[in-house]
Amino acid sequence: MEVVLSVQSINKHYPGFTLENVSFSLAPNRIMGLIGKNGAGKSTTLKAILNMVSPESGSVTMFQKNFYQHEKECKQRIGVVFGGIDFYPLKKLSTITAVTQKFYTNWDQAQYQKYIKHFSLNESKKFKELSSGMKVKYLLALALSHHAELLILDEPTSGLDPVSREELLHIFRQIVKSEKCSILFSTHITSDLDRCTDDITYIQNGRVLQSADKDTFLRSFEHLKTPDDTGPLTLEEIMLRTERSEWDDDITV
């Protein structure tokens, strides 16, 4: 199967936390949600993929190339959005864009202007003046303006109100359809996954519990059902029951 991203046996150790043998893959034109509670290892996984932290072992392949050996080349083909980032907070969007576009050989100004208009962004505003949702939209506009084939997003919907979050998830679906790219995004909000993902990877305490297409993922947790459950479990119920089982084990120990 063709993949745009393959993560194989990534390991990273910190005092009190270990990312252990993390593996999953993402196919073209798909959206994968990376789910887990706060502190499960989602952000560390994304940072290890991008070599923002150096994994102790494992490999990452993007576009059939070893990312760590071809990092500069691969980064020309990806877009990265980390929620909560306030880079150049006092600079106008136009100034940030002028700096950013110099790093990409295939920068498309017409594409940039299309998304600035589509997202109703005002380039004369300073970055710090944007709402959380508008900041994410601006960062998406930058990523899409160099025709990114893979978007890696860390908690992009965190802190957004329900309306803004729903709008952003709709944008993700539109992007995958119109721009022919794939998206990997982390979240602890299970409703995000219900609305827009094709695939789900669930991380618990630095380990991947399951990684599969959404239907297969849901079926793989049917053992958590009780006699009182008349229908399939929701993603929220799966996560709550899985984490509750861990709490019970900790108490028993």
What are these regions (language model features)?
Residues 7-10, 17-27, 58:
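Conserved beta-strand
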Residues 162-164:
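Helix N-cap at the start of a conserved alpha-helix in ABC-type nucleotide-binding domains
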Residues 151-155:
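Catalytic Walker B motif of ABC-type/P-loop ATPase nucleotide-binding domains
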Residues 82-138:
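ABC-family P-loop ATPase nucleotide-binding domains
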Residues 35-37:
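The feature captures the beta-strand-to-loop junction immediately N-terminal to the Walker
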Residues 50:
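Helix-to-loop junction immediately C-terminal to a conserved catalytic motif
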Residues 58-69, 73-74:
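Conserved ABC transporter NBD signature motif
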